[in-house]
Amino acid sequence: MDQCPIPTLLEHGNFSQVLFNNVEKFYAPRGDIMCYYTLTEKFIPRRKDWIGIFKVGWKTTQEYYTFMWAPLPKDQNKDSATQQEIQFKAYYLPKDVERYQFCYVDEDGLVRGTSVPFQFCPDPDEDIMVVINKEKVEEMEQLSEELYQQNQELKDKYADLHEQLQRKQVALEATQRVNKTLEHKVEEKASWEKEKASWEEEKASWEEEKASWEEEKASWEEEKASWEEEKASWEEEKASWEEEKASWEEEKASWEEEKASWEEEKASWEEEKASWEEEKASWEEEKASWEKEKASWEEEKASWEKEKAPWEVEKAPWKEVKAYWWNDLHR
Protein backbone atom coordinates (compact mmCIF):
# COMPACT_ATOMS: atom_id res chain seq x y z
CA MET A 1 0.00 0.00 0.00
CA ASP A 2 1.02 3.61 -0.49
CA GLN A 3 2.19 5.46 2.58
CA CYS A 4 -0.08 8.35 3.44
CA PRO A 5 1.28 11.84 4.17
CA ILE A 6 0.56 12.28 7.86
CA PRO A 7 2.18 14.64 10.37
CA THR A 8 4.15 13.37 13.32
CA LEU A 9 1.74 14.80 15.93
CA LEU A 10 -2.04 14.58 16.02
CA GLU A 11 -3.85 17.73 15.00
CA HIS A 12 -7.36 17.61 16.45
CA GLY A 13 -10.24 18.69 14.24
CA ASN A 14 -14.00 18.50 14.41
CA PHE A 15 -14.74 14.75 14.85
CA SER A 16 -18.42 15.20 13.92
CA GLN A 17 -17.92 16.31 10.28
CA VAL A 18 -17.73 12.66 9.10
CA LEU A 19 -20.09 10.09 10.64
CA PHE A 20 -19.45 6.33 10.47
CA ASN A 21 -22.56 4.15 9.99
CA ASN A 22 -23.42 0.48 10.54
CA VAL A 23 -20.20 -0.29 12.37
CA GLU A 24 -20.28 -3.87 13.75
CA LYS A 25 -18.98 -4.70 17.20
CA PHE A 26 -17.25 -7.77 15.79
CA TYR A 27 -15.85 -8.52 12.32
CA ALA A 28 -15.00 -12.04 11.21
CA PRO A 29 -11.24 -12.67 11.05
CA ARG A 30 -9.60 -13.17 7.62
CA GLY A 31 -12.50 -11.51 5.83
CA ASP A 32 -12.95 -8.25 3.93
CA ILE A 33 -14.95 -5.56 5.73
CA MET A 34 -17.02 -2.65 4.44
CA CYS A 35 -16.77 0.80 5.99
CA TYR A 36 -19.86 3.01 5.62
CA TYR A 37 -19.70 6.72 6.45
CA THR A 38 -21.54 9.99 5.83
CA LEU A 39 -19.97 13.30 4.75
CA THR A 40 -21.99 16.09 6.38
CA GLU A 41 -23.17 19.02 4.23
CA LYS A 42 -20.61 21.44 5.71
CA PHE A 43 -17.62 19.15 5.11
CA ILE A 44 -15.66 19.54 1.84
CA PRO A 45 -13.68 16.37 0.97
CA ARG A 46 -10.32 16.56 -0.80
CA ARG A 47 -8.25 14.19 -2.93
CA LYS A 48 -5.70 13.27 -0.24
CA ASP A 49 -8.24 12.48 2.54
CA TRP A 50 -7.94 8.96 3.92
CA ILE A 51 -9.60 6.49 6.31
CA GLY A 52 -7.41 4.55 8.72
CA ILE A 53 -7.96 1.71 11.18
CA PHE A 54 -6.49 2.71 14.55
CA LYS A 55 -6.08 0.77 17.79
CA VAL A 56 -8.23 2.38 20.50
CA GLY A 57 -6.11 4.72 22.59
CA TRP A 58 -4.05 6.09 19.69
CA LYS A 59 -2.32 9.48 20.21
CA THR A 60 -1.07 10.51 16.76
CA THR A 61 -2.23 9.81 13.24
CA GLN A 62 1.02 7.95 12.62
CA GLU A 63 -0.32 5.08 14.73
CA TYR A 64 -2.66 3.76 12.04
CA TYR A 65 -2.59 0.00 11.38
CA THR A 66 -3.73 0.30 7.77
CA PHE A 67 -5.47 2.90 5.65
CA MET A 68 -7.32 3.48 2.36
CA TRP A 69 -7.61 6.68 0.33
CA ALA A 70 -11.10 8.10 0.71
CA PRO A 71 -12.80 8.35 -2.72
CA LEU A 72 -14.32 11.68 -3.71
CA PRO A 73 -18.13 11.80 -4.05
CA LYS A 74 -19.48 11.57 -7.59
CA ASP A 75 -21.48 14.77 -7.09
CA GLN A 76 -19.46 17.26 -5.06
CA ASN A 77 -21.90 20.12 -5.62
CA LYS A 78 -24.63 18.64 -3.41
CA ASP A 79 -25.59 20.73 -0.39
CA SER A 80 -26.83 17.70 1.56
CA ALA A 81 -25.02 14.89 3.36
CA THR A 82 -23.37 12.27 1.15
CA GLN A 83 -23.26 8.53 1.83
CA GLN A 84 -19.90 6.85 1.04
CA GLU A 85 -18.41 3.40 1.48
CA ILE A 86 -14.97 1.78 1.16
CA GLN A 87 -13.73 -1.80 1.41
CA PHE A 88 -10.73 -2.97 3.44
CA LYS A 89 -9.13 -6.20 2.19
CA ALA A 90 -8.59 -9.01 4.72
CA TYR A 91 -4.86 -9.23 3.94
CA TYR A 92 -4.24 -5.76 5.44
CA LEU A 93 -6.46 -6.14 8.53
CA PRO A 94 -5.23 -6.79 12.12
CA LYS A 95 -4.91 -10.41 13.23
CA ASP A 96 -5.32 -9.85 16.97
CA VAL A 97 -8.42 -9.31 19.12
CA GLU A 98 -7.58 -5.77 20.23
CA ARG A 99 -10.22 -3.04 19.92
CA TYR A 100 -9.96 -0.82 16.83
CA GLN A 101 -11.91 2.08 15.29
CA PHE A 102 -12.22 3.90 11.95
CA CYS A 103 -10.83 7.46 11.68
CA TYR A 104 -11.35 9.89 8.80
CA VAL A 105 -8.23 12.13 8.35
CA ASP A 106 -8.14 15.03 5.86
CA GLU A 107 -5.07 15.92 3.77
CA ASP A 108 -4.04 18.52 6.39
CA GLY A 109 -3.74 15.79 9.03
CA LEU A 110 -6.91 16.77 10.94
CA VAL A 111 -9.22 14.01 12.21
CA ARG A 112 -12.75 14.76 10.95
CA GLY A 113 -14.59 11.71 12.30
CA THR A 114 -14.19 8.55 14.40
CA SER A 115 -16.27 5.37 14.73
CA VAL A 116 -17.28 3.26 17.69
CA PRO A 117 -14.75 0.54 18.67
CA PHE A 118 -14.85 -2.95 17.10
CA GLN A 119 -12.87 -6.23 17.18
CA PHE A 120 -11.74 -8.84 14.67
CA CYS A 121 -13.09 -12.04 16.25
CA PRO A 122 -16.26 -14.18 16.18
CA ASP A 123 -19.29 -12.79 18.01
CA PRO A 124 -19.42 -14.60 21.43
CA ASP A 125 -23.18 -14.01 21.63
CA GLU A 126 -23.79 -16.22 18.59
CA ASP A 127 -23.92 -19.93 19.22
CA ILE A 128 -23.66 -21.43 15.76
CA MET A 129 -22.82 -24.97 15.06
CA VAL A 130 -21.46 -25.66 11.66
CA VAL A 131 -21.20 -29.18 10.40
CA ILE A 132 -18.76 -29.71 7.62
CA ASN A 133 -17.95 -33.08 6.14
CA LYS A 134 -14.42 -34.39 5.81
CA GLU A 135 -14.11 -33.58 2.12
CA LYS A 136 -15.17 -29.99 2.76
CA VAL A 137 -12.61 -29.66 5.53
CA GLU A 138 -9.87 -31.00 3.27
CA GLU A 139 -10.99 -28.63 0.51
CA MET A 140 -10.91 -25.68 2.90
CA GLU A 141 -7.48 -26.72 4.23
CA GLN A 142 -6.19 -26.96 0.66
CA LEU A 143 -7.69 -23.57 -0.14
CA SER A 144 -6.13 -22.18 3.03
CA GLU A 145 -2.75 -23.61 2.00
CA GLU A 146 -3.10 -22.09 -1.48
CA LEU A 147 -4.07 -18.77 0.01
CA TYR A 148 -1.10 -19.00 2.35
CA GLN A 149 1.21 -19.71 -0.58
CA GLN A 150 -0.31 -16.81 -2.52
CA ASN A 151 0.13 -14.66 0.56
CA GLN A 152 3.82 -15.64 0.78
CA GLU A 153 4.27 -15.00 -2.94
CA LEU A 154 2.65 -11.60 -2.59
CA LYS A 155 4.90 -10.81 0.37
CA ASP A 156 7.96 -11.89 -1.59
CA LYS A 157 6.77 -9.91 -4.60
CA TYR A 158 6.16 -6.91 -2.36
CA ALA A 159 9.68 -7.25 -0.93
CA ASP A 160 11.12 -7.52 -4.46
CA LEU A 161 9.13 -4.51 -5.62
CA HIS A 162 10.22 -2.56 -2.56
CA GLU A 163 13.85 -3.48 -3.23
CA GLN A 164 13.46 -2.51 -6.91
CA LEU A 165 11.89 0.76 -5.84
CA GLN A 166 14.84 1.44 -3.51
CA ARG A 167 17.32 0.65 -6.30
CA LYS A 168 15.43 2.88 -8.75
CA GLN A 169 15.34 5.64 -6.14
CA VAL A 170 19.12 5.35 -5.71
CA ALA A 171 19.56 5.30 -9.51
CA LEU A 172 17.26 8.32 -9.83
CA GLU A 173 19.27 10.25 -7.24
CA ALA A 174 22.50 9.28 -9.04
CA THR A 175 20.98 10.39 -12.36
CA GLN A 176 19.93 13.69 -10.82
CA ARG A 177 23.46 14.21 -9.50
CA VAL A 178 24.86 13.38 -12.96
CA ASN A 179 22.37 15.80 -14.56
CA LYS A 180 23.44 18.56 -12.17
CA THR A 181 27.08 17.79 -12.95
CA LEU A 182 26.33 17.87 -16.70
CA GLU A 183 24.42 21.13 -16.35
CA HIS A 184 27.38 22.59 -14.45
CA LYS A 185 29.74 21.33 -17.17
CA VAL A 186 27.50 22.80 -19.92
CA GLU A 187 27.48 26.17 -18.15
CA GLU A 188 31.24 25.92 -17.64
CA LYS A 189 31.72 25.02 -21.33
CA ALA A 190 29.63 28.03 -22.40
CA SER A 191 31.83 30.22 -20.20
CA TRP A 192 34.92 28.66 -21.77
CA GLU A 193 33.54 29.26 -25.28
CA LYS A 194 33.01 32.95 -24.48
CA GLU A 195 36.51 33.19 -23.03
CA LYS A 196 37.91 31.36 -26.08
CA ALA A 197 36.17 33.82 -28.43
CA SER A 198 37.73 36.66 -26.45
CA TRP A 199 41.13 34.97 -26.74
CA GLU A 200 40.66 34.52 -30.50
CA GLU A 201 39.89 38.23 -30.90
CA GLU A 202 42.90 39.12 -28.78
CA LYS A 203 45.04 36.71 -30.83
CA ALA A 204 43.91 38.36 -34.08
CA SER A 205 44.87 41.72 -32.59
CA TRP A 206 48.27 40.28 -31.61
CA GLU A 207 48.76 38.91 -35.15
CA GLU A 208 48.07 42.34 -36.65
CA GLU A 209 50.44 43.94 -34.14
CA LYS A 210 53.06 41.28 -34.94
CA ALA A 211 52.77 42.03 -38.67
CA SER A 212 53.30 45.70 -37.87
CA TRP A 213 56.34 44.77 -35.76
CA GLU A 214 57.72 42.65 -38.62
CA GLU A 215 57.41 45.59 -41.04
CA GLU A 216 59.06 47.89 -38.49
CA LYS A 217 61.81 45.29 -37.95
CA ALA A 218 62.47 45.13 -41.71
CA SER A 219 62.76 48.92 -41.71
CA TRP A 220 65.19 48.70 -38.77
CA GLU A 221 67.25 46.08 -40.63
CA GLU A 222 67.52 48.37 -43.68
CA GLU A 223 68.47 51.28 -41.44
CA LYS A 224 71.03 49.07 -39.66
CA ALA A 225 72.58 48.12 -43.01
CA SER A 226 72.81 51.82 -43.84
CA TRP A 227 74.49 52.43 -40.47
CA GLU A 228 76.94 49.59 -41.14
CA GLU A 229 77.89 51.16 -44.48
CA GLU A 230 78.25 54.56 -42.84
CA LYS A 231 80.35 52.98 -40.08
CA ALA A 232 82.64 51.41 -42.69
CA SER A 233 82.99 54.83 -44.28
CA TRP A 234 83.86 56.30 -40.89
CA GLU A 235 86.43 53.55 -40.32
CA GLU A 236 88.06 54.39 -43.67
CA GLU A 237 88.03 58.09 -42.83
CA LYS A 238 89.51 57.32 -39.41
CA ALA A 239 92.31 55.35 -41.06
CA SER A 240 92.92 58.35 -43.30
CA TRP A 241 93.05 60.59 -40.23
CA GLU A 242 95.51 58.20 -38.57
CA GLU A 243 97.75 58.40 -41.64
CA GLU A 244 97.44 62.18 -41.66
CA LYS A 245 98.28 62.25 -37.94
CA ALA A 246 101.41 60.20 -38.60
CA SER A 247 102.31 62.68 -41.31
CA TRP A 248 101.78 65.54 -38.87
CA GLU A 249 103.97 63.74 -36.30
CA GLU A 250 106.74 63.54 -38.90
CA GLU A 251 106.13 67.18 -39.75
CA LYS A 252 106.34 68.03 -36.03
CA ALA A 253 109.73 66.34 -35.83
CA SER A 254 110.76 68.30 -38.87
CA TRP A 255 109.51 71.49 -37.19
CA GLU A 256 111.60 70.68 -34.12
CA GLU A 257 114.69 70.39 -36.29
CA GLU A 258 113.66 73.49 -38.19
CA LYS A 259 113.14 75.32 -34.89
CA ALA A 260 116.74 74.61 -33.97
CA SER A 261 117.87 75.98 -37.28
CA TRP A 262 115.52 78.96 -36.80
CA GLU A 263 117.21 79.72 -33.53
CA GLU A 264 120.53 79.81 -35.33
CA GLU A 265 119.10 81.86 -38.13
CA LYS A 266 117.36 84.22 -35.73
CA ALA A 267 120.57 86.04 -35.15
CA SER A 268 121.01 86.52 -38.84
CA TRP A 269 117.32 87.49 -39.14
CA GLU A 270 117.91 90.28 -36.71
CA GLU A 271 120.52 91.66 -39.05
CA GLU A 272 118.22 91.22 -42.00
CA LYS A 273 115.28 92.72 -40.09
CA ALA A 274 116.23 96.19 -41.14
CA SER A 275 116.06 95.22 -44.75
CA TRP A 276 112.78 93.38 -44.14
CA GLU A 277 111.21 96.57 -42.86
CA GLU A 278 111.79 98.08 -46.25
CA GLU A 279 110.15 95.11 -47.88
CA LYS A 280 107.23 95.26 -45.38
CA ALA A 281 105.52 97.95 -47.41
CA SER A 282 105.43 95.72 -50.44
CA TRP A 283 104.25 92.82 -48.30
CA GLU A 284 101.34 94.94 -47.05
CA GLU A 285 100.09 95.17 -50.60
CA GLU A 286 100.34 91.45 -50.98
CA LYS A 287 98.56 91.03 -47.61
CA ALA A 288 95.35 92.46 -49.07
CA SER A 289 95.30 89.73 -51.70
CA TRP A 290 96.16 87.15 -49.03
CA GLU A 291 93.16 88.30 -46.96
CA LYS A 292 90.85 87.37 -49.85
CA GLU A 293 92.37 83.95 -50.06
CA LYS A 294 92.28 83.69 -46.28
CA ALA A 295 88.44 83.80 -46.28
CA SER A 296 88.32 80.64 -48.35
CA TRP A 297 91.08 79.11 -46.23
CA GLU A 298 89.13 79.95 -43.06
CA GLU A 299 86.12 77.90 -44.28
CA GLU A 300 88.38 75.00 -45.08
CA LYS A 301 90.23 75.55 -41.82
CA ALA A 302 86.92 75.30 -39.82
CA SER A 303 86.48 71.72 -40.97
CA TRP A 304 90.14 70.96 -40.30
CA GLU A 305 89.90 72.49 -36.85
CA LYS A 306 87.31 69.89 -35.79
CA GLU A 307 89.63 67.09 -36.78
CA LYS A 308 92.82 68.83 -35.60
CA ALA A 309 91.56 69.75 -32.09
CA PRO A 310 93.64 67.08 -30.31
CA TRP A 311 96.65 67.84 -32.43
CA GLU A 312 96.32 71.57 -31.87
CA VAL A 313 96.74 70.96 -28.15
CA GLU A 314 100.13 69.48 -28.87
CA LYS A 315 101.03 72.13 -31.47
CA ALA A 316 100.08 75.11 -29.28
CA PRO A 317 103.65 75.69 -27.99
CA TRP A 318 105.04 75.57 -31.48
CA LYS A 319 102.42 78.01 -32.73
CA GLU A 320 103.47 80.52 -30.09
CA VAL A 321 107.11 80.23 -31.15
CA LYS A 322 106.16 80.49 -34.80
CA ALA A 323 103.95 83.54 -34.14
CA TYR A 324 106.83 85.18 -32.25
CA TRP A 325 109.19 84.61 -35.14
CA TRP A 326 106.56 85.77 -37.59
CA ASN A 327 106.03 89.03 -35.71
CA ASP A 328 109.77 89.59 -35.53
CA LEU A 329 109.98 88.87 -39.24
CA HIS A 330 107.39 91.52 -40.13
CA ARG A 331 108.40 94.27 -37.77
UniProtKB/Swiss-Prot annotation:
Keywords: Autophagy, Coiled coil, Cytoplasm, Cytoplasmic vesicle, Cytoskeleton, Membrane
Superkingdom assignment: Eukaryota
Locations listed in the record: Cytoplasm, Perinuclear region; Cytoplasm, Cytoskeleton; Cytoplasmic vesicle, Autophagosome membrane
Coiled coil: 132-309
Topological type in the membrane: Peripheral membrane protein
GO annotation terms (biological process): positive regulation of autophagosome maturation; xenophagy
Segments carrying motif CLIR: 128-131
One GO CC term, this protein: autophagosome membrane
Classification via InterPro entries: SKICH, UBA_autophagy_assoc_protein
Span(s) of short sequence motif LIR-like: 190-193
Region (Interaction with LGALS8) location: 292-302
Quaternary structure and interacting proteins, as annotated: Dimer. Part of a complex consisting of CALCOCO2, TAX1BP1 and MYO6. Interacts with MYO6. Interacts with GEMIN4. Interacts with ATG8 family members MAP1LC3A, MAP1LC3B, GABARAP, GABARAPL1 and GABARAPL2. Interacts with ATG8 family member MAP1LC3C. Interacts with LGALS8. Interacts with TOM1; the interaction is indirect and is mediated by MYO6, which acts as a bridge between TOM1 and CALCOCO2. Interacts with AZI2.
Entry function: Xenophagy-specific receptor required for autophagy-mediated intracellular bacteria degradation. Acts as an effector protein of galectin-sensed membrane damage that restricts the proliferation of infecting pathogens upon entry into the cytosol by targeting LGALS8-associated bacteria for autophagy. Initially orchestrates bacteria targeting to autophagosomes and subsequently ensures pathogen degradation by regulating pathogen-containing autophagosome maturation.
Domain notes per entry: The LGALS8-binding domain is essential for the recruitment to cytosol-exposed infecting bacteria. The CLIR (LC3C-interacting region) motif is required for interaction with MAP1LC3C, but dispensable for CALCOCO2-mediated autophagosome maturation.
Family: Belongs to the CALCOCO family.
Protein name, UniProt field: Calcium-binding and coiled-coil domain-containing protein 2
Gene field: Calcoco2
